[in-house]
Amino acid sequence: MNNPDDVLLINRFLRQQHVLTLCAGSGMDMWCASCFYVFDENQMALFLMTEKHTRHSELMLINPQVAGTVATQSRTIALIKGIQYRGDISLLSGDAEQAARNRYCRRFPVAKVSSAPLWQLNLLEIKMTNNALGFGKKLHWSRVEPL
């Protein structure tokens, strides 16, 4: 069972940030990328835009299981906040792609000129470190219902 207080803090953090590190892999081939994202609180999903021909996208098409981080860049240890996540990612199409594109372009207007595809990263598990609540304080969330 997810702690509602943890969920509120995790959601707030994900809404406030906009860049994630995405790690994809297949067999012994692994690659990471930094991507802008939009958070969908209702689906506990992140929408991101990246071309299909990139190394990380090619890996995601082979193996949709990904992991990554979202972190602040605080110089003060007492203020460090960040998320480690794992999830499943898929290339969007049709109405779902258009809805995600509209939402993404509202957050990042420069993306309106891009035809790069949109992806949906369904979060499965999150561990958040929030030193503002006490050094090393961890918050957790995991998906309880199947996708």
From Swiss-Prot:
Record-given protein name: UPF0306 protein YpsIP31758_3570
Organism: Yersinia pseudotuberculosis serotype O:1b (strain IP 31758)
Family recorded in the similarity comment: Belongs to the UPF0306 family.
The organism's place on the tree of life at top rank: Bacteria
